[in-house]
């Protein structure tokens, strides 16, 4: 592993500043933070990944995702995120972790072979909503985290750029968009951007993510 870090005091930074005119394209679907917090925004559904220590998606259980009902395009994943623990806030130090936490893009292209795509996340979120209304809170995945997926996605290389320091008390809500620029021969080039509640850019990341097909991993283990 090779890591290069360039640090600076952003609060003391001074220099030329201009409005570039850059915006998200397509624009994000409108959301009300108060409605999201109350799980009543008609355009978004909440989804929390059930935790199980043997699940390869267990790390996502620390964040509650809000997924739009409307699907932009298959190569885009939009989410509002908030800590699963109501006593926690997102801090600047957590941004590197959050930038590696997007729900999987490739699963959008394989809806019949995976449970991580947007359609599956919406369906799971609606089931969780029914459970909440019935007074059922599922925090453990009883099936050993057996999420269906054709492959495991790895971060081979990652660059992270912090554009804004979060407040010292942290942030309860952030918006994240992940989008693939190319998916070819088992390699995905993608970018992730994080915004605060006012949709001001906080951080961005470029990533190269190879995919390892689970069937190939199983075959390799059997040969050992």
Outline where the language-model segments fall.
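Terminal targeting signals and extreme-terminal segments of soluble enzymes
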Residues: 1-224
């Amino acid at each position: 592993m090779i890591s290069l870090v360039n640090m600076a005091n952003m609060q003391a930074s001074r220099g030329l500043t201009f409005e570039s005119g850059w915006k998200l394209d397509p624009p994000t679907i409108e959301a009300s933070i108060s409605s999201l917090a109350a799980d009543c925004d008609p355009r978004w559904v909440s989804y929390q990944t059930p935790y199980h220590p043997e699940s390869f998606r267990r790390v996502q259980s620390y964040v509650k995702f809000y997924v739009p009902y409307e699907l932009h395009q298959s190569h885009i994943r939009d989410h509002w995120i908030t800590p699963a623990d109501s006593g926690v806030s997102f801090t600047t130090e957590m941004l590197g972790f959050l930038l590696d936490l997007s729900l999987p893009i490739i699963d959008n292209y394989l809806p019949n072979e995976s449970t991580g795509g947007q359609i599956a996340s919406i369906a799971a979120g609606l089931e969780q909503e029914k459970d909440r209304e019935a007074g059922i809170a599922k925090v453990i995945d009883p099936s050993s985290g057996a999420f269906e997926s054709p492959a495991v996605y790895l971060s081979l290389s990652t660059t992270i750029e912090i554009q804004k320091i979060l407040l010292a008390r942290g942030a309860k809500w952030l918006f994240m968009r992940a989008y693939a620029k190319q998916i070819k021969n088992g390699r995905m080039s993608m970018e992730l951007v994080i915004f605060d509640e006012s949709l001001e850019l906080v951080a961005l990341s470029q990533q190269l993510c190879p995919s390892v097909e689970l069937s190939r991993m199983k075959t390799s283990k059997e040969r050992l």
